């Protein structure tokens, strides 16, 4: 379903913005309370683990965010890869967020 694609979600939420700028800004707003879980990459097991987050936009739109942070280059610079940023296929529930304060 197109609604659950990265492109559709970014275009819907940030229609008047450069998508790269919008995603960079949104990543900077993530907090430990948005954290859901850490997952291994089954397809690329030698890569670093991925972190899953969830945020609610416009009061009702659950958005699933998955990132991978890797050390690249000889100076150990970190690069963040956005693996997923799309409307959640299942509604978020409180137990999905281990560090969320009520």
Predicted regions, residues:
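Enriched for short, Lys/Arg-rich terminal
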Residues: 62-63, 68-102
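Compact soluble domain cores
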Residues: 1-47
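Functional cores of ribonucleases/endoribonucleases
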Residues: 29-77
């Amino acid at each position: 379903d197109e609604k659950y694609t990265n492109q559709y979600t970014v275009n819907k939420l940030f229609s008047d913005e450069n998508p790269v700028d919008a995603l960079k800004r949104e990543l900077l707003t993530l907090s430990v309370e948005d954290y859901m879980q850490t997952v291994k990459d089954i397809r690329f097991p030698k890569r670093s683990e991925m972190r899953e987050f969830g945020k609610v936009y416009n009061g009702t739109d659950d958005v699933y965010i998955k990132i991978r942070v890797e050390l690249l280059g000889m100076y150990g610079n970190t690069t963040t890869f956005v693996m997923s940023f799309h409307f959640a296929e299942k509604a978020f529930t409180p137990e999905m967020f281990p560090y969320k304060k009520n």
